[in-house]
Swiss-Prot record:
Its cofactor is FMN. The keyword Methyltransferase does not apply. PANTHER family: FLAVODOXIN-RELATED PROTEIN WRBA-RELATED, FLAVOPROTEIN-LIKE PROTEIN YCP4-RELATED. Residues 3-153 form the Flavodoxin-like domain. It comes from the Bacteria. This is Flavodoxin. Low-potential electron donor to a number of redox enzymes. The keyword Transport applies. InterPro entries: Flavodoxin/NO_synth (IPR008254), Flavodoxin_CS (IPR001226), Flavoprotein-like_sf (IPR029039), FMN_Rdtase-like_dom (IPR005025). Keywords: Electron transport, Flavoprotein, FMN, Transport.
Length: 160
């Protein structure tokens, strides 16, 4: 089984969180994972992935233009039936990350992906729409990113 983590990052913060999520996926065991910046996507690995996690910085309560452009131009990939999840980074808790996550999730559903957030059933961290990493809060944030990755990996194994 394979999981791709796709992200855009200008300052390195979203890239750092993508790598933390990758650590969580690896904790789940028996899943090959690759973390890729949107400008260096391994097309073969992505197409072979059962799960894809999308990550974006939050700008003005929205996704990065790079993520939007990639989604708009990704018709070469058949994502139907794959498990999709999303995470975002923001400088503050009121930065609009929930709206950014919903934007990604809407696009994933249009592409026919199954959408999973990690949910609230397993307790903290509760990820209603996906994982949000707030840059100004550090306590437990790194571990929460790992837990999110592990939960997505476990769901991929359960479904596929």
């Amino acid at each position: 089984m394979k999981i791709s983590i796709l992200y855009s990052s200008k300052t390195g913060k979203t890239e750092r969180v993508a790598k933390l999520i990758e650590e969580g996926v690896k904790r789940s065991g028996n899943i090959e994972v690759k973390t890729m910046n949107l400008d260096a996507v391994d097309k073969k690995f992505l197409q072979e992935s059962e799960g894809i996690i999308f990550g974006t910085p939050t700008y003005y309560a929205n996704i990065s233009w790079e993520m939007k452009k990639w989604i708009d131009e990704s018709s070469e990939f058949n994502l139907e039936g794959k498990l999709g999840a999303a995470f975002s980074t923001a400088n503050s808790i009121a930065g609009g990350s929930d709206i950014a996550l919903l934007t990604i999730l809407n696009h994933l559903m249009v592409k026919g992906m199954l959408v999973y957030s990690g949910g609230v059933a397993f307790g903290k961290p509760k990820t209603h729409l996906g994982y949000v990493h707030i840059n100004e809060i550090q306590e437990n944030e790194d571990e929460n990113a790992r837990i999110f990755g592990e939960r997505i990996a476990n769901k991929v194994k359960q479904i596929f």
